[in-house]
From Swiss-Prot:
InterPro entries, per the entry: Ankyrin_rpt, Ankyrin_rpt-contain_sf, Ion_trans_dom, TRPV, TrpV1-4
Cytoplasmic side: 1-390, 456-471, 515-537, 643-764
UniProt xrefs under NCBIfam families: trp (TIGR00870)
Organism: Homo sapiens (Human)
CDD domains (UniProt xref): TRPV2 (cd22197)
Protein name (database record): Transient receptor potential cation channel subfamily V member 2
Taxonomy, superkingdom: Eukaryota
ANK repeats mapped onto the chain: 72-114, 115-161, 162-207, 208-243, 244-292, 293-319
GO biological process assignments: calcium ion import across plasma membrane; calcium ion transmembrane transport; positive regulation of axon extension; positive regulation of calcium ion import; positive regulation of cold-induced thermogenesis; response to temperature stimulus; sensory perception
Transmembrane segments: 391-411, 435-455, 472-492, 494-514, 538-558, 622-642
Alphabetical keyword list: ANK repeat, Calcium, Calcium channel, Calcium transport, Cell membrane, Cytoplasm, Glycoprotein, Ion channel, Ion transport, Membrane, Phosphoprotein, Repeat, Transmembrane, Transmembrane helix, Transport
Gene that specifies this protein: TRPV2
Length: 764
């Protein structure tokens, strides 16, 4: 039998007459709908939109007269009707007909023109109680005919369902009996369904990892998964990947959606596949396999924002299978538990770590909920405690820089003088020049830092706009600072507006350092949410109203009433206003859009006056417009803004703490990755032996120790690694879980460890 991976054999199909032209047969059946027809429909038949082909006409030497139709002839409609009904007796005479006409069941004559659906797929699509009696006869007929392209491995050929095979359909129909029948007859268990319908994208689709094993896992068919992995004919490989490099574990991560029903399905299947992999291929670490984006299943969950499966992988603990666990219970006493978490792929000391993915590359707007999961929460807190001095040093440097900035801006020379200070040996000018140079250097430093920040997040900056709020303001401050200083040294007076704008942004950006404290940090988060969610929308609508009413008032003011122009030699003098009349008359006129907008803004904040010139021609219309503007803006929009801001504060109150945690995490990683901080990153945790590997060697991992109090499951008996929190000989002590370098050994061979007292539980 031809192997599934063998290349197609070139051959010419035969034509024995009687085939209907595709355009005539399908006339009136064209699909004018917005979507493509499904693979199988009881309301629409298969089409005949075949691509042009060169065939051998078997009736070439026969007479040209009209011939009677052959009653033994099998066309596609007869074959499809027989297999869809599941009546194998209707296939009598099919082997003889195929042998007589040199045809195969995979010829285009027996497939659907647009999709390439075969009679075997048609039979599998029409199962009754999980079986179809025509499947086995079709496979036997195809095998006996010597088909160089076996029917069992035929796939759909269109862009939408490309690669879809009968085995995929049998798995989707949840028929283990049909799956066994196909695999026993040579079905390719690694066939890839890579059409657009099976790719993750916009619109209706179902991405399951393309492979039959992934489809069975994603549809919760453990019996099919077990058979595919352990069948004696062609066992499926857990290491097989799809066109994106994703394994079955990656596919399970992709289909998770954080709902209770879905996560129960995904986690049970995920754990089952890990245990099956440990039994079938113990030397392979399935969770270390990376896809084409260089992501493991854990990193993929972090990047896609799959919170629940991410939590499950991080906190997975198997009893008796320590080499598959990422969490280990070291010691417990009542509800108090000391747990060890595996930091592989998590700590920022590694390239493309989970922490960096969440902070800089995650697509989900809810990624702030991942940084509060253990061990990330305590790990980030430990890093923060270590980097607090650097954080406040940055704050002190920025504060000094802003004082220098303020002093230079306050002592600027008048615009009539030269903008840049004279290079004379005077104390005032020298200090002013030095201040300008320091401001320029600080602006360049800040600009380079922010450009590097946005370069690292160039794809996802708009997705995570909320936590990049200050970084965007810092970027604008740096740009304004550099441009203003360049204009200053070029003696261009427009440097001053840019300078004071940068000064205002600089003082506002000092609020960035409020994230170092919980109360001010959460308050800052709420301010950002209100600005980005409510205030921006209010300003957009308000500007539309303001521009429309301003243009209307300017147009009406141009039609002010004037006396009729007299005739005679004194005509010019009679139309000129009296002394003081021009100022009085033009004071209330809306002579331009800017003046009208300023007057209307006064109405918005309740400071406008309805007094206007008596000589306005459309006095009533102007009054009506002003009243309408007051109703729409001062009464409607402002009160709506207040209500929306209150709702926003209430809705984000539960997430403000986690968003603040995420902002702290970004600050921690930025301080670790500082372009001027040339110190090597410190690794967190400690190297411990948590068990043995399948080959008997010790299982050593970098672990991070976390103290937890869990009243929900404290009655469970869990295996522990030691009898007390720190090991024998050191009562009531616990190794410091903060950042640590690899332990050094002293002369006696004992490792140097820092110990801190265990926090005691106190009850009132």
């Amino acid at each position: 039998m031809t192997s599934p991976s063998s290349s197609p054999v070139f051959r010419l199909e035969t034509l024995d007459g009687g085939q209907e032209d595709g355009s005539e047969a399908d006339r009136g059946k064209l699909d004018f709908g917005s979507g493509l027809p499904p693979m199988e429909s009881q309301f629409q038949g298969e089409d005949r939109k075949f691509a042009p082909q060169i065939r051998v006409n078997l009736n070439y030497r026969k007479g040209t007269g009209a011939s009677q139709p052959d009653p033994n002839r099998f066309d596609r409609d007869r074959l499809f009707n027989a297999v869809s009904r599941g009546v194998p007796e209707d296939l009598a005479g099919l082997p003889e007909y195929l042998s007589k006409t040199s045809k195969y069941l995979t010829d285009s004559e027996y497939t659907e023109g647009s999709t390439g659906k075969t009679c075997l797929m048609k039979a599998v699509l029409n199962l009754k109680d999980g079986v179809n009696a025509c499947i086995l006869p079709l496979l036997q007929i195809d095998r006996d005919s010597g088909n160089p392209q076996p029917l069992v491995n035929a796939q759909c050929t269109d862009d939408y369902y490309r690669g879809h095979s009968a085995l995929h359909i049998a798995i989707e129909k949840r028929s283990l009996q049909c799956v066994k029948l196909l695999v026993e007859n040579g079905a390719n268990v690694h066939a890839r369904a890579c059409g657009r319908f099976f790719q993750k994208g916009q619109g209706t689709c179902f991405y399951f990892g393309e492979l039959p094993l992934s489809l069975a896992a994603c549809t919760k068919q453990w019996d099919v998964v077990s058979y595919l992995l352990e069948n004696p004919h062609q066992p499926a490989s857990l290491q097989a990947t799809d066109s994106q490099g994703n394994t079955v574990l990656h596919a399970l991560v992709m289909i998770s959606d954080n709902s209770a029903e879905n996560i129960a399905l995904v986690t049970s299947m995920y754990d089952g596949l890990l245990q099956a992999g440990a039994r079938l291929c113990p030397t392979v670490q399935l969770e270390d396999i990376r896809n084409l984006q260089d992501l493991t299943p854990l990193k993929l969950a972090a990047k896609e924002g799959k919170i629940e499966i991410f939590r499950h992988i991080l906190q997975r603990e198997f009893s008796g299978l320590s080499h598959l666990s990422r969490k280990f219970t070291e010691w417990c006493y009542g509800p108090v538990r000391v747990s060890l978490y595996d930091l592989a792929s998590v700590d920022s000391c590694e390239e493309n770590s989970v922490l960096e993915i969440i902070a800089f590359h995650c697509k989900s707007p809810h990624r702030h909920r991942m940084v509060v999961l253990e061990p990330l929460n305590k790990l980030l807190q430990a890093k923060w405690d270590l980097l607090i001095p650097k954080f406040f040093l940055n704050f002190l440097c920025n504060l000094i820089y802003m004082f220098i900035f303020t002093a230079v801006a306050y002592h600027q020379p008048t615009l009539k003088k030269q903008a840049a200070p004279h290079l004379k040996a005077e104390v005032g000018n020298s200090m002013l020049l030095t201040g300008h140079i320091l401001i320029l250097l600080g602006g360049i430093y800040l600009l380079v830092g922010q450009l590097w920040y946005f370069w690292r997040r160039h794809v996802f900056i708009w997705i995570s706009f909320i936590d990049s709020y200050f970084e965007i303001l810092f970027l604008f401050q740096a740009l304004l600072t550099v441009v203003s200083q360049v204009l200053c040294f070029l003696a261009i007076e427009w440097y001053l507006p840019l300078l004071v704008s940068a000064l205002v942004l600089g003082w506002l950006n000092l609020l960035y350092y409020t994230r170092g404290f919980q109360h001010t940090g959460i308050y800052s988060v709420m301010i950002q949410k209100v600005i980005l969610r409510d205030l921006l929308r209010f300003l957009l609508i308000y500007l539309v109203f303001l521009f429309g009413f301003a243009v209307a008032l300017v147009s009406l003011s141009q039609e002010a009433w004037r006396p009729e122009a007299p005739t005679g030699p004194n005509a010019t003098e009679s139309v000129q206003p009296m002394e003081g009349q021009e100022d009085e008359g033009n004071g209330a006129q809306y002579r331009g859009i800017l003046e009208a907008s300023l007057e209307l803004f006064k109405f918005t904040i309740g400071m406008g006056e309805l007094a206007f010139q008596e000589q306005l021609h459309f006095r009533g219309m102007v009054l009506l417009l002003l009243l309408a503007y007051v109703l729409l803006t001062y009464i409607l929009l402002l009160n709506m803004l207040i209500a929306l801001m209150s709702e926003t504060v209430n809705s984000v109150a539960t997430d403000s703490w986690s968003i603040w945690k995420l902002q702290k995490a970004i600050s921690v990683l930025e301080m670790e990755n500082g372009y001027w901080w040339c110190r090597k990153k410190q690794r967190a945790g400690v190297m411990l032996t948590v068990g043995t590997k399948p080959d008997g060697s010790p299982d050593e991992r970098w672990c991070f120790r976390v103290e937890e109090v869990n009243w929900a499951s404290w009655e469970q008996t869990l295996p522990t690694l030691c009898e007390d929190p720190s090991g024998a000989g050191v009562p009531r002590t616990l190794e410091n879980p903060v950042l640590a370098s690899p332990p050094k050994e002293d002369e006696d061979g004992a490792s140097e460890e820092n110990y801190v007292p265990v926090q005691l539980l106190q009850s009132n």
